[in-house]
Amino acid sequence: MQKDGTRSSRRMEEGDRRNGSTGSSGSVSRELGRGFSYYNKYLARLQQNLRDTKRFFRDIKHTYSGAPGGPDTDIKGAEGDLGQLHSITFPRQEEEYLKLTVRCRPCIFILGQSCSSRGRVANSLLGDQLLPILTHCGSECCKRRRIRFRYGKQTLVSLALPEQYELVHELVAHQGKWDTIPEEDLDVPEDEEDPAHRLAELEVTLPHQLLQDVDIVVSPCRSSQAVSMTLEDYVDHVQSIVVYAVCEERLSQQDEEELTEIKEKYKLPVFFIRTSSTRDRLIGGSEGVRSALYEQLMELGFLKRGLCNCGAAGSGSTAPSMLVEQFEKLRQVSTFSRQVLQMHLVDAAIVLNMVHSRCLDLFINKAFDMHRDLQITPKRLEYTRQKENELYESLMRISDRKQEELKDMIVETLNSMREQLLEDAANMQFKDIAIPQNGEPVSVQEVKCCIFQIKELIISRLNQAVVNKLISSVDYLRESFVGTLERCLRSLEKSQQESSSHVTSNHLKQILNAAYHVEVTFNSGSTVTRMVWEQIVQIIQRITWVSPPTITPEWKRRVAQDAIESLSASKLAKSICSQFCKRLKSSHEAFAASLKQLEVGHSGRLEKTNDLWLRVRKDHAPRLARLSLESRSLQDVLLHGKPRIGRELGRGQYGVVYLCDSWGGHFPCALKSVVPPDEKHWNDLALEFHYMRSLPKHERLVDLHGSVIDYSYGGGSSIAVLLITERLHRDLYVGLKTGLSLETRLQIALDVVEGIRFLHNQGLVHRDIKLKNVLLDKKHRAKITDLGFCKPEAMMSGSIVGTPIHMAPELFSGKYDNSVDVYAFGILFWYICSGSVKLPEAFEKCASKDHLWNNVRKGARPERLAIFDEECWKLMEACWNGDPSQRPLMGIVQPMLQGIMDRLCRAQETGKALEDST
């Protein structure tokens, strides 16, 4: 079997008719064509975003892999530098799903109760009588095979195995002209024994405009092949649109089983169309009567009560099934197909955006970690060096002044232990020495061993007592210095990835443990032990015997007494202090050398971390944020459509705000149109959008409903991003001009503080708190808007942004934190307390922005007005303090402001009450 190069081909004589250009069937074809054009437009955008996403992950992988493009290429190869960035990958499951989605071609499956009903639907879709309408509808003897209509420049008919190859077979259609496909070619011959020919489908290629966008597959008769086999052959590599033609009043049991299998196995929505002409079949008539077919579909779970059966989209993630009981309304299949394809695109856009958002959050979290590492590691190193030096000096001072105390401690210890030592010595049982029970003398050698063991007892007891008292005298140093040092070293060791640095850190910890746990011991080779042993030898030499003594308790007690009296407390104290100082100095020098080595290792690591932080902040995160903005905007426009722009509400430096009556179920809305002029503005806008979408809803922040990218803005000359937000009554600037009561103004201040505090808790800095960025609802409650400059501290580059009169002095240095919002609130609070929008005198005198900035840097601030309450003025001054570290946190400002409001408003109410009483 091979491709038939001699198969019949002819051009259709009625090209216009075959292209669906006339009659009601032609309108169905045109409606479907428009729906597929809509699908193809957004599919192209999804494909482009997916290509850009794959390129992004490929670039990340190659940038941080030791062997770009190699077989073992993996971002984990740079895990030492990247940390969390090794998980910035395109998950395989999501990637395969998205690849399949964008490659799948739409396909309309025409199923149904009979060949006649299926043929009628196919003819109507194609606008021509291509399939014969049989009279023996549903006959068991029907053997019609599967039919597939595809696009081709010429009209061709052939037999082919699905997605494989064509069969060499002479068809009736090859023998001459035809308008309707011959029935002989449509049916499987009863005497056909070749299984390939029995399973083959009739493939028809037509130069039909509709077929450029979609294939049409007409299922075979049940006696020829089960419907499930048709779906099984195609469903995994096409976007399925299922049409079910009904020619009877009710579904048969076999129909129900067939539909149940489709629903449970493939979970596909179905468009049901009744092909027979009947009377009074309008669903939802004046009496609200439902047909038997409708009730059956309800029981099967294809239709739901409360949903319009005409195809209105539900709120779920899948398109609903539809029932149309008038064949004249077949054009509604275009609405159904559009919903089905749209939900495929929406699902793909959601998956793609989830990948973008997850990886973008990882980038931002890693930026936080790197930023903190860059800030804290040098401080930890300096802190470790400083604390170790303090510990060293403290211990040296202790050693210098403790010698006399040690002498007294030794004397005191010996006196307190004397009786117990003598008693223990008298009762001592010697090891490895046999003492006669009858009191006979022992040899000189055995006497020496006995004296040595008595010495060992005295030395061990004295050592333990002296060391315990010495350690207790420096315990506070061990707790306050050594514990902190060890914690800092553990932290530095974790952040240093090189193996050599692990050795250095471990060695450093060992030195600390050896040097600073102050364990004074009398080793066998130590000066103290030798000194004590010499004294014991002198004791032995002083005892002269004519013959070896008898080992009695009295003798043991006398030997112990002489040994104790021979010990010199001053010499012992001097020896202990000398040994302690020597070990301390040696350990201090080793510590300093090891710390220097560790610092060198961290210096190289921090340099790499800083480079990576800059790349994440300036390249990786903005690039991924733009892809995220595109995928989320695609999802929003598919679900809710393009918003209708109303009258202009205002304009700012970066965009125009319009009225938008309703969008996505929200009413009313405001629409901010932004046309980014360059890549930097695109990146800033994309990151702003991500931060806003990532924030939990908060009553003191303006809600962002969604975004749409308008590729046709300005006649297609530029691209605009439309941000749809909730619409409020007015901004604070207009509110103050109109006039607001003191209580209302203080409540607005509290609302602003609550909003700023929430942003700070989320790790964000607004950077542009001002009158026009505070919106008021009809109840005069405030919400913060315009997060255009809002960023996490770790993602800030030090850009000079904001509105001049609200900008903190440190903004001009490029090194600042969230305290710039506290400063801006202080200026805003000045306006709130003044009750007007008049500029402060110090700012009004400035002729230019540069003049204003210079004055602010020099300490210029708004003046105190006569109407200001003392506590309000102190709060303003605290907020705009020139030293950022002296400004109060918003968590402190909020209760202070609440107290001011309670006091002032209560005073006002008391005054009014007094006036009323008079």
Curated annotation (Swiss-Prot):
Sequence similarity: Belongs to the protein kinase superfamily. Ser/Thr protein kinase family.
Region (Disordered) residue spans: 1-29
Domain of life: Eukaryota
Primary localisation category: cytoplasm
Organism: Xenopus tropicalis (Western clawed frog)
Cross-referenced InterPro entries: Dual_SerThr-Tyr_Kinase, Kinase-like_dom_sf, Prot_kinase_dom, Protein_kinase_ATP_BS, Ser/Thr_kinase_AS
Task of the protein: May act as a positive regulator of ERK phosphorylation downstream of fibroblast growth factor-receptor activation. May induce both caspase-dependent apoptosis and caspase-independent cell death. May play a role in the embryonic development.
Reaction(s) the record says it catalyses: L-seryl-[protein] + ATP = O-phospho-L-seryl-[protein] + ADP + H(+); L-threonyl-[protein] + ATP = O-phospho-L-threonyl-[protein] + ADP + H(+); L-tyrosyl-[protein] + ATP = O-phospho-L-tyrosyl-[protein] + ADP + H(+)
Residue sites binding ATP per the record: L649, G650, R651, G652, Q653, Y654, G655, V656, V657, K672
Lineage start: Eukaryota, Metazoa, Chordata, Craniata, Vertebrata
Compartments, as annotated in UniProt: Cytoplasm; Cell membrane; Apical cell membrane; Basolateral cell membrane
GO MF entry, a single one: ATP binding
Designated gene of the protein: dstyk
GO cellular component terms attached to this protein's record: anchoring junction; apical plasma membrane; basolateral plasma membrane; cytoplasm
GO BP term, example: embryonic organ development
Domain Protein kinase per the UniProt entry, residue ranges: 643-897
Official protein name in the record: Dual serine/threonine and tyrosine protein kinase
Segments of skewed composition (Basic and acidic residues): 1-19
